[in-house]
Swiss-Prot record:
The gene is coaE. NCBIfam families: dephospho-CoA kinase (TIGR00152). InterPro entries: Depp_CoAkinase (IPR001977), P-loop_NTPase (IPR027417). This is Dephospho-CoA kinase. PANTHER family: BIFUNCTIONAL COENZYME A SYNTHASE-RELATED, DEPHOSPHO-COA KINASE-RELATED. GO terms for cellular component: cytoplasm. Keywords: ATP-binding, Coenzyme A biosynthesis, Cytoplasm, Kinase, Nucleotide-binding, Transferase. It catalyses: 3'-dephospho-CoA + ATP = ADP + CoA + H(+). The keyword Cytoplasm applies. It comes from Francisella tularensis subsp. tularensis (strain SCHU S4 / Schu 4). Belongs to the CoaE family. Pathway: Cofactor biosynthesis; coenzyme A biosynthesis; CoA from (R)-pantothenate: step 5/5. PROSITE patterns: DPCK (PS51219). Residues 8-204 form the DPCK domain. It is found in: Cytoplasm.
């Protein structure tokens, strides 16, 4: 799929890698439109038809006040890779359709597509992305960030990280990799500016 008005760039990274900070910098400092898969997912899971399907899979107790209990759902997919795969396989097509729609409507020269779960196993569905930026950080840094940011203990932090694919897997689809282990936000911003400039030069 080709987009006439914009150049879609994927960004991904594991939990607590600093990917969200990088995305915010691209939006606020570089004035690029951002399409966020997580935001789209939250909106989609508010739809009655989707709520019904998820309840059929995981039980009516997953619904609270006519909405998906996201904390309960998160706990289920943390404990079960099968449940996580089912949820991703079910939600993926409709999320991807909305991502494409929003990218098509974007009015900036480049559009950042924030997809936390992007990897070799599903990249064929996102082959419209012209470049992919991977944000990574070493394991101990990510564990520390999760413990400080979310109040998790070490075991919980490791469990969350292990649910996701490894940085090594992510790097298989990367055009650019930024190691955010020890970067300040200002240093991260500088790296991102350099990366976007490189992409701009490649497209000219």
């Amino acid at each position: 799929m080709n987009f006439i008005n914009t150049y879609p760039i994927g960004i991904t990274g594991g939990i607590a890698s600093g990917k969200s900070t990088a995305t915010r910098i691209l939006k606020e400092k570089l004035n690029l439109n951002v399409v966020c898969a997580d935001t789209i997912s939250r909106e989609i899971t508010k739809k009655p038809s989707v709520i019904k399907k998820i309840a059929e899979k995981f039980g009516d107790e997953i619904v609270m006040n006519k909405q998906i209990n996201r904390a309960m759902l998160r706990a289920i997919i943390t404990e079960s890779k099968e449940a996580k795969k089912w949820l991703e396989d079910y939600l993926h097509p409709v999320i991807n359709k909305e991502i494409k729609k929003q990218v098509k409507e974007s009015d900036t020269v480049m559009t950042i597509v924030d997809i936390p779960l992007l990897g070799p196993y599903n990249f064929r569905h996102y082959d419209y992305l012209k470049k992919v930026i991977v944000i990574k950080a070493d394991l101990e840094t990510r564990i520390r960030r999760l413990m400080e940011r979310d109040g998790k203990n070490r075991q919980q932090a490791v469990a969350f990280i292990n649910l996701q694919i490894s940085d090594k897997e992510r790097e298989k689809i990367a055009d650019f990799v930024i190691d955010n282990t020890e970067l300040t936000n200002q240093e991260l911003e500088s790296k991102l500016i350099t990366t976007i400039n490189e992409i701009t030069n490649l497209t000219n």
